[in-house]
C-alpha cells in the first residue's frame, strides 16, 4: 500500500483492506476516501456498498476516473502485481501513469464504499496549485498512454473519448497563460494526439 506524506489514514485502513481482499479472493482491494480541508472531512462515497470487478471492468472504471480513482493510496495490492513496473521519474500524476498497468495483472478487484483514507487539500499541492500547463500536459500524457494501452489490449473501444475530453480541457486552459515556445509545442503535440481519435463521438 501507499500513503502520501501530506495525508493520513484511519488506524484500521490496512486491516480493512486486507480483510476485504481475502474475503473476496481478489488481488486488489479499494476503500473510498475523505477530502480534508479546513478541518472538515467530506466523503463522496460512504454507503458501505461493495463492488467486485473483473480485471477489464476495473480498468474501464479507472479510465472513467470517478468512482474508482487513479490513486495508489486508497488501495491494497498483492506485491506480485508490481513485477516489472516502475514509477516514472520527474513526472507528476505518476499514479495515473502506472495504476492501470498494475490492474492489468489482477484477476479481480474489490471496492467498498467505506472511507478510510484522508486526502488533504492544501494550497500548493499538485492538484490545487496555480495553473501550470506543463503539469496538465503530464496529466494529458498519462491519460493518452492509459487509453492507448486499453485499446491495444482490446479492453474498451470507447476509451478514446477521455483523450479528447482531457485534450479539449488542456487547450481551453492554455488560453489563460501567456503564449510561449513551450506552450506552443504542448498545443501541437496535444492536437496531434487528439487527431488519432477523430472517430470518437463526444
Predicted regions and their residues:
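Donor-binding/catalytic cores of nucleotide-activated saccharide
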Residues: 7-112, 120, 124-134
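Amphipathic, well-ordered alpha-helical segments in soluble domains
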Residues: 115, 142-145, 167-170
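C-terminal, non-catalytic tails of nucleotide-sugar-dependent glycosyltransferases
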Residues: 141-162, 199-201
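Secondary-structure edge/capping motif, primarily at the C-terminal ends of alpha-helices
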Residues: 150-154, 174-181
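Amphipathic alpha-helical repeat scaffolds of TPR domains
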Residues: 162-174
Amino acid at each position: 500500500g501507499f500513503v502520501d506524506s501530506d495525508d493520513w489514514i484511519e488506524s484500521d485502513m490496512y486491516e480493512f483492506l486486507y480483510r476485504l481482499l481475502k474475503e473476496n479472493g481478489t488481488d486488489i482491494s479499494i476503500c473510498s476516501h475523505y477530502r480534508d480541508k479546513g478541518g472538515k472531512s467530506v466523503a463522496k462515497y460512504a454507503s458501505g456498498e461493495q463492488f467486485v470487478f473483473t480485471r477489464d471492468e476495473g480498468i474501464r472504471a479507472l479510465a472513467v476516473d470517478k468512482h474508482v480513482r487513479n490513486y495508489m493510496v486508497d488501495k491494497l495490492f498483492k506485491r506480485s502485481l508490481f513485477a516489472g513496473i516502475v514509477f516514472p521519474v520527474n513526472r507528476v500524476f505518476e499514479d495515473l501513469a502506472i495504476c492501470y498497468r498494475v490492474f492489468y495483472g489482477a484477476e479481480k478487484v474489490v471496492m467498498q464504499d467505506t472511507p478510510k483514507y484522508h486526502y488533504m487539500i492544501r494550497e500548493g499541492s499538485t492538484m490545487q496549485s496555480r495553473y501550470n500547463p506543463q503539469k496538465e500536459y503530464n496529466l494529458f500524457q498519462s491519460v493518452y498512454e492509459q487509453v492507448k494501452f486499453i485499446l491495444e489490449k482490446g479492453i474498451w473501444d470507447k476509451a478514446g473519448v477521455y483523450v479528447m475530453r482531457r485534450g479539449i480541457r488542456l487547450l481551453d486552459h492554455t488560453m489563460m497563460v501567456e503564449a510561449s515556445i513551450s506552450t506552443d509545442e504542448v498545443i501541437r503535440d496535444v492536437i496531434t494526439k487528439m487527431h488519432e481519435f477523430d472517430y470518437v463521438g463526444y
